[in-house]
Amino acid sequence: MMDSVLEEDVTVPGTLSGCSGLVPSVPDDLDGINPNAGLGNGVLPNVSEETVSPTRARNMKDFENQITELKKENFNLKLRIYFLEERMQQEFHGPTEHIYKTNIELKVEVESLKRELQEREQLLIKASKAVESLAEAGGSEIQRVKEDARKKVQQVEDLLTKRILLLEKDVTAAQAELEKAFAGTETEKALRLRLESKLSEMKKMHEGDLAMALVLDEKDRLIEELKLSLKSKEALIQCLKEEKSQMASPDENVSSGELRGLCAAPREEKXRETEAAQMEHQKERNSFEERIQALEEDLREKEREIATEKKNSLKRDKAIQGLTMALKSKEKXVEELNSEIEKLXAAFAKAREALQKAQTQEFQGSEDYETALSGKEALSAALRSQNLTKSTENHRLRRSIKKITQELSDLQQERERLEKDLEEAHREKSKGDCTIRDLRNEVEKLRNEVNEREKAMENRYKSLLSESNKKLHNQEQVVKHLTESTNQKDVLLQKFNEKDLEVIQQNHYLMAAEDLELRSESLITEKCSSQQPPGSKTIFSKEKKQSSDYEELIQVLKKEQDIYTHLVKSLQESDSINNLQAELNNIFALRKQLEQDVLSYQNLRKTLEEQISXIRRREEESFSLYSDQTSYLSICLEENNRFQVEHFSQEELKKKVSDLIQLVKELYTDNQHLKKTIFDLSCMGFQGNGFPDRLASTEQTELLASKEDEDTIKIGEDDEINFLSDEHLQQSNEIMKDLSKGGCKNGYLRHTESKISDCDGAHAPGCLEEGAFINLLAPLFNEKATLLLESRPDLLKVVRELLLGQLFLTEQEVSGEHLDGKTEKTPKQKGELVHFVQTNSFSKPHDELKLSCEAQLVKAGEVPKVGLKDASVQTVATEGDLLRFKHEATREAWEEKPINTALSAEHRPENLHGVPGWQAALLSLPGVTNREAKKSRLPILIKPSRSLGNMYRLPATQEVVTQLQSQILELQGELKEFKTCNKQLHQKLILAEAVMEGRPTPDKTLLNAQPPVGAAYQDSPGEQKGIKTTSSVWRDKEMDSDQQTSYEIDSEICPPDDLASLPSCKENPEDVLSPTSVATYLSSKSQPSAKVSVMGTDQSESINTSNETEYLKQKIHDLETELEAYQNFIFQLQKHSQCSEAIITVLCGTEGAQDGLSKPKSGSDGEEMTFSSLHQVRYVKHVKILGPLAPEMIDSRVLENLKQQLEEQEYKLQKEQNLNMQLFSEIHNLQNKFRDLSPPRYDSLVQSQARELSLQRQQIKDGHGICVISRQHMNTMIKAFEELLQASDVDYCVAEGFQEQLNQCAELLEKLEKLFLNGKSVGVEMNTQIELMERIEEDNLTYQHLLPESPEPSASHALSDYETSEKSFFSQDQKQDNETEKTSVMVNNFSQDLLMEHIQEIRTLRKRLEESIKTNEKLRKQLERQGSEFDQGSTNIFASGSELHSSLTSEIHFLRKQNQALNAMLIKGSRDKQKENDKLRESLSRKTVSLEHLQREYASVKEENERLQKEGSEKERHNQQLIQEVRCSGQELSRVQEEVKLRQQLLSQNDKLLQSLRVELKAYEKLDEEHRRLREASGEGWKGQDPFRDLHSLLMEIQALRLQLERSIETSSTLQGRLEEQLARGAEKAQEGALTLAVQAVSIPEVPLQLDKHDGDKYPMESDNSFDLFDSSQAVTPKSVSETPPLSGNDTDSLSCDSGSSATSTPCVSRLVTGHHLWASKNGRHVLGLIEDYEALLKQISQGQRLLAEMDVQTQEAPSSTSQELGTKGPHPAPLSKFVSSVSTAKLTLEEAYRRLKLLWRVSLPEDGQCPLHCEQIGEMKAEVTKLHKKLFEQEKKLQNTMKLLQLSKRQEKVIFDQLVVTHKILRKARGNLELRPGGSHPGTCSPSRPGS
């Protein structure tokens, strides 16, 4: 067993030993923890040699101590085991069994002891835990008690200190008060002394005053005595006076003068004496009184002073008493506080004692516990020492080593963790640097983003500029294309003109005879027609111009509105400055144009007022001629005949008569051809798809109207009219084709211009004029029309020329009575008209028509005066009267009278054929002709030229007249026959038309009867469709550039194209029109075209009233229901199709113009047809005939007669005009009754009703087509909306709402389409849509003012106006819808207000419409009643006189209506402008919001930059702090190194001194030995010498060395103290460099004293050198410090210290601190130092050289060794001592030189004045800082630039807003000027004019 134990022991490593001595060797813990407590559990005890508390963490030293103790115990245990084994082997050499037994027993005991030990260890662990818990509890309680006691003591101390402070303050205050009080008492004492002295003086004075008072009393007594004497004397005087009076009473006879003289002398003497005495007394008295008063005042003042002094002294006494009381109270309080402080101090001492006692008790308890523990440990140690079990000890040691290794690993982990923390700190620092870099990168990114934004803005502006340039380029190309096409057309027209001139020259001679025949009849009619005023034509043309100016003004307003909408869009889309500038330019141009329009309007108004006043003066003169005017043709042809009269002789006129006979024959063939065409028309059954052009429909309806009107006359004359109308239709269709292909709107105008310039010449006007007409016709012929038209122009011209000749003959016979006053006015009127045309040409510079008129005026300036005026009138007439012949048949019907039927029948065809060129030209251009026809229906014929002043001077004979009259009568008879045939044919045509209109489902254009030329068009329907589509597309393109002209072309003649081309649009919409153009096409063209066709039919229907009122009412009701359904559809569109606003907003500008144009046209047509067609025709014809009479024919007598008649007629006219308004309704009813009496009227009414039915069906079809197209448009819009939703991020709810609304709109359109197809009544939907209808009614009523409100028109006419107003409202309603949608998208608040406004307007308009319908019905009933009361015979007589009144009243009424309509439109325009301004304001507000947002962003960026700057500055400060810390640490290190070096130097110095002392002692010993030898050798030889001299020198050297040693020790101690002080003050010196100078001043003077002390007298040269050095350094250091800033206090300290230490020959290093010596460098190639040090070094070197030379000499003089041996040894000691002294001095000089060298230091020369080490870092930092500053500066610059741009855009928006305000003001002025017009055109100043609009 022992072997096994030993073997186990062998396995233990050598570092471990036995554990037998482990437990006793471990000392006990203070807290009583048993070190064995953890051993039983395998835990290493926590106790090292030092007493370690269990809670404290152990460090490596504890573990090492423990390991060493364990090793020692292990070794001891091993030794004990070895000795015990040896002892056991010695004892037990016997049998081993006993040993085994004892061993087994011992093992058993050991096991039992182990168990006991474990139990005890567990008990000990429990006890130790209990003790620990108790100790912790007691310790925590003791700590808490201590803390409470400490807190209380602290509180008490604080309170006491506060009280003490307060008391000290109070004491100081009280002392101050006491001092003040003492000072006050002293001052009071002084004052009292003064007062007492003053009182004594006052008393003395008072005694003097008493004496004075006695004197005064005496004087007062004297004064009183004097007063008494005075009184007595006065009494005497009184007595004397009484005596005198008594004496005077008895002696009355004595003279009064004597008595007075006697009394006066004594009285004066007495009075003088008394006065003198009184004065003296008074003066004395006054002086005494003054002195008394002064004395009294002095007394009072002194008494007051004494009283105040007494009061002050009392106060002071009281204050002193109060202060003493306060002092006593304060002293008491101080004593109390002192007692409290003593008590508290005693309590504090007791508490301390208690604490100490508790601590001592605790320590005693712990000591007892420790003693118990030590006893237990001693027992356990004894047990262990007895048992000596190796295995358990080894296992425990192993466990403990494992624990130690674990703890070591834990410590290493902690160390690693700390290292990681350090690394993390470094990483955080690097992260901070990274964040700085990131911030810099972000700044750079921001700058790049700003640059990118600027580049994007620049690219955007460039793209916008390029787009605008492209648009301009495209427009220029379009303009070039148009000009090229116009040039081509000009070339073609010139060719045709040449051909026409040839044809005219061939046919010219055939027409002379017929002109002679027609001249007689024209002369007959001339007698009657010469009384018409000449100015009416110009008036009418001026009225047309005025109305056209109204239209232009409206168009300008609409254009400006479009520009405003475009401006709003551009503001919303982009902030481009170029767009804004362009919009500004547009606004300026509009403003200028508007100002010009206003000026032209004012001039126009002036001229109109003058013309109206002139016409008013002439109107009365023409009344007498109305009964004589019989023939319409005689009026129409007189002017034109004048042109040819001056060029033809009588033979030529006879030839023209024969030509006229030939013409009648040809007319017969034409009549036959017309029969054939009517038969073909009726046989065809109208199987075609509809006529391709609505031009035919408009012409045909007017043709039918003319035929109906002619049925009332008993003669047949319609064959020529129909033929002429057919010609017109064919020609107009051809010119329409030509226009649509060429794209030229004003081709016709060029022809008129050339014609007028030719006609103005005087060479051959007839031929040129005819050539111009033929030239107009020539390019318009197609292949199938040429056969019909080849013979017609020549024949028609022959007829016209014959009639002109007859007119000339008749005019020669006309009396000149009525000519003078009328021709006199023509030049003035013509001149005014010229001015009017010029102003209008300026008012619309883009209108080519006006420009052509202006060009004609310029050309006409070359001809004579009359020609100029004629040409000016003519150019205006070209615009105003182009379609007169189209409606002449209608006028003829009203002009026919039973008296002159034969003559009129004979002349009518000739008239119609007399101007074929004009008719063809007028109908050839659809836009101009139909527009002007709509403008004015007055049949004013255009004159070829009026420069014909000599044409009336040709001779004429009576024979020619009679011949011509007979021939004319024959021709009239033939014409009667032809007209009867024509009437029959006409009736057949009406029946065919009725059959056509009666079809159940008529085609779209069935209502337009096909003319005779229609067959030609049926052959090529595809070509016509192509023409029409191209024309419609061309119109869409031209709509923006020239709205007025293109609109008039579209809406009056061309709109039939639009619906006709709809099928092609449906089939192939991409080829023809885009969706936008389809919408534009629908809204702007289709509805007005329908309206125009309605107007064409209603012109005839308005006259044909009958008693079928119930039927008409039913029709009106049906139409209203259909219209309401249509309005519901419109409202649904208005409500739901918000997405279509972008497509429909394009139409806003044109629709208003269309509405404004269309409605006055409808009103004018109706009124003109109703009132003034017949009368105005004749009236105007007379004006035109009489206008151009030459002024040479005016007679002075006739002029006087005319003046008288004018005055009379003006008076009568004034009276009649006052009665006009009263007679208005009666005249109209009578006139309608006259028309209704003829039987064919009722047939025509039936036909008109059938026509209305067909028209309604057509309208339903049109509505169906519109619904189909709008539904398709809605489908495309829904698809586009879905794509937009996919493309953009839109709110889902909003998108869903929009999609639902669009779907509802599409469903409504489908329902409406089905209703149009099925024809069901819409009344079912009315209940659910009453609210919608109210809104539509209000919208209708907004345009009620444009409807004719006059009570004259019949119900059918009112109905047609109602329909047209509804259709025009559709476009206007779309406009309003678009505007409301726009505003609802932009500003949602506007939608509600607009909705309410629309509802109110619709309601009011609906009410007014119903009232107008009721008044129309009442008027119809009145017409029917009054029609039965008059017979036919009186109608014709009465009508001639009544129609003037009716025309006047109708014109007045119409002008009023027109003014109201224009005012309303202006109000609406201003309202629209206000809305646009509001939108602009909103856009401005949005811009300001965006500006503020940008400013906020700018502020945030600025704050970010400031924050970055602050962070950068903070980082810089942090870096500087770190640099300073590094410097400080470097300085500290250098100081420590220098201290170590100094100590080493001191040690080396001491060693050297010791060595030198030892050498000297050895030398001394050798000398002693030599002396002894010498003494021994020769006892007498040394006596003669002085051996003590050498000893004395050695002793002196030793003493000097000792002194030097002592002084070096002193200097080392002082240096050590100074080094410690410097180390203590090192941080302060690093921060405060100012102290270094003081240290320098202190440190430098110390060393010379030390040098003086320890150098002594032995080395005077050394001391002198050192003094020189330090004196020079003293003198120079301040200068060097001031001159060279790198030298600091530390350096000077190092110099002084080194110089101090160098006195002891210590090598010194100059201390150079970084940061102060910027030039110092270890690797420097230069040396820097003071010049004094350098000079001292040179001195030392020279001294050393001298010493070495002396030593060299001594060594040479020394005797050789042989001489020494020989015995010559006497003189040796002296040279040896000198050599030793020279060696020592050489050493000292070398050391001093070394020290001087150490004072210099190595430097590197400065590079550009900067330190290469430190300044590079500073330079880098500065460079980074400057970079950051530059970046910030650039960013601020960019932000400022953006701010400037924003401010500039804001200013531009302000400028735009100001311009808009200015334009708004101008519009207001224009509206005011327009509102002035109704006041000027009151009934008394109006004329029967017909302005067209």
Curated annotation (Swiss-Prot):
Residues 1015-1071, 1347-1381, 1467-1486, 1500-1521, 1675-1706, 1752-1774, 1874-1893 are annotated as: Disordered. The modification Phosphothreonine is found at residue 1001. Keywords: Calmodulin-binding, Cytoplasm, Cytoskeleton, Golgi apparatus, Microtubule, Phosphoprotein. Residues 1196-1893 are annotated as: Interaction with PCNT and AKAP9. GO terms for cellular component: centrosome; cytoplasm; Golgi apparatus; microtubule; microtubule plus-end; mitotic spindle pole; pericentriolar material; perinuclear region of cytoplasm. Phosphorylated in vitro by CDK5. The modification Phosphoserine is found at residues 547, 1238, 1490, 1663, 1666, 1893. Residues 1726-1768 are annotated as: Interaction with CDK5R1. This is CDK5 regulatory subunit-associated protein 2. It comes from Pan troglodytes. The gene is CDK5RAP2.
